[in-house]
Amino acid sequence: MCMPCFTTDHQTARRCRDCCGGRGRKCFGQCLCGYD
């Protein structure tokens, strides 16, 4: 299971989405992972 990730860093956000199998969402410049 992917841990929640809140970041405005582009590189970190991309890794976050990759960790979540591409299901990470961009919300107000942040990547929210683990919530689907």
UniProtKB/Swiss-Prot annotation:
GO cellular component: extracellular region
Gene Ontology terms for molecular function: chloride channel regulator activity; toxin activity
Record's keyword annotation contains Secreted: yes
Disulfide bonds: C2-C19, C5-C27, C16-C31, C20-C33
Main location group: secreted
PROSITE patterns xrefs: SHORT_SCORPION_CHLORIDE
Statement: the UniProt record of this protein carries the keyword Ion transport: no
Distribution of this protein across tissues and organs: Expressed by the venom gland.
Keyword field: Chloride channel impairing toxin, Disulfide bond, Ion channel impairing toxin, Knottin, Secreted, Toxin, Voltage-gated chloride channel impairing toxin
Pfam family name, one: Toxin_5
Chain's role: Toxin with unknown function in healthy organisms. On glioma cells, interacts with chloride channels (probably ClC-3/CLCN3) and MMP2 at the surface of glioma cells. This complex is then internalized via caveolae, thus inhibiting the chloride channels necessary for cell shrinkage and tumor propagation.
Family: Belongs to the short scorpion toxin superfamily. Chloride channel inhibitor family.
Additional detail: The protein sequence was deduced by comparison to other short insectotoxin sequences.
Domain comment as written in the entry: The presence of a 'disulfide through disulfide knot' structurally defines this protein as a knottin.
Record's protein name: Insectotoxin-I3
The organism's taxonomic lineage, starting at the top: Eukaryota, Metazoa, Ecdysozoa, Arthropoda, Chelicerata
